[in-house]
Amino acid sequence: MLELVKVLGLFAITALAEIIGCYLPWLVLTQQRPVWLLIPAAVSLGLFAWLLTLHPGAAGRIYAAYGGVYVAIALIWLWRIDGVVPTRWDLVGSAVSLAGMAIIMLQPARSV
């Protein structure tokens, strides 16, 4: 179970790196923010790619499970950074995504 907690923490950090790496260019392209924001965006996306290499197990399975955590973190970003309160549909969708992640990660006799 401790291993699962570590993997979930790594998923959350990976999701933040991906979201930041995509959000900063979005700000530059749609909100006329300074172009220099593309530098930390590139660093964040590089960090995201590196973090993906730290996940144990088959890449496809890890990426599929990571998607569930990504959805939850993205909705937290929506709420805390964008200032938009998630709807109940957002929350249900996130719960379904997290349930899918749990099914993938907790399958019996998995090799992570």
Swiss-Prot record:
Any one of the GO CC terms: plasma membrane
Membrane topology, record value: Multi-pass membrane protein
InterPro entries registered for this protein in UniProt: UPF0060
Segments passing through the bilayer: 7-27, 34-54, 59-79, 89-109
Pfam family, one: UPF0060
Family of the protein in this entry: Belongs to the UPF0060 family.
HAMAP family hit by this protein: UPF0060
PANTHER family to which the protein is assigned, alphabetical: UPF0060 MEMBRANE PROTEIN YNFA (PTHR36116:SF1)
NCBIfam families hit by this protein: PRK02237.1
Protein known as: UPF0060 membrane protein Daro_2632
Species of the source: Dechloromonas aromatica (strain RCB)
